[in-house]
């Protein structure tokens, strides 16, 4: 739960997704893994956090270098050539170290970022969203932090990016949760961050221990559909908080 400076309460995007997910596949996996399930989940969480931290460090370091270079030349915007220089410079610096369980995943994200990123508009940005005409005595909407808003070399416009790690290829159900997560973040940006000018689409980059990542794209209209999907899940989640509460406009 997140409370903003005015006292409004927002529930976590990831918690809402968990509470409204179809957990049959997860329960089957837990039954199959037995006592190892908890350990495997903990390892996966740790490696994901560390791999995320590494790519976040790359982007923030590149931003500092690019902004400093642009300011020193009196430029209002960062040219793509300057960003390319800054990103390469960031890769020559020493990033946070990764342990053996996460080094392959971190390298996978590093390589994708270096190959595709042409600029950034935001990194680890917190969003909140209150659906139109929504009222509830229990919460005011949802909140979360998206990984990055990036300009990409091979696609026009600004893209909402989410980093994931996985030892195995993800099934359709879990991918659907990832897409709905992007939809939730998209809604918050549209509501509170008009300077980002809307997204051309979204992309989920799932790092693997070895080899290239699994990359899944959502075009602009598909991202809007996923925003609607998450809004419906949020309404279902709120109804579960109290069956008798009012959710007008949902």
Give the residues covered by each predicted segment:
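Mg2+/Mn2+-dependent nuclease catalytic core
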Residues: 124-247
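Metal-dependent nuclease catalytic cores that hydrolyze phosphodiester bonds in DNA/RNA
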Residues: 1-143
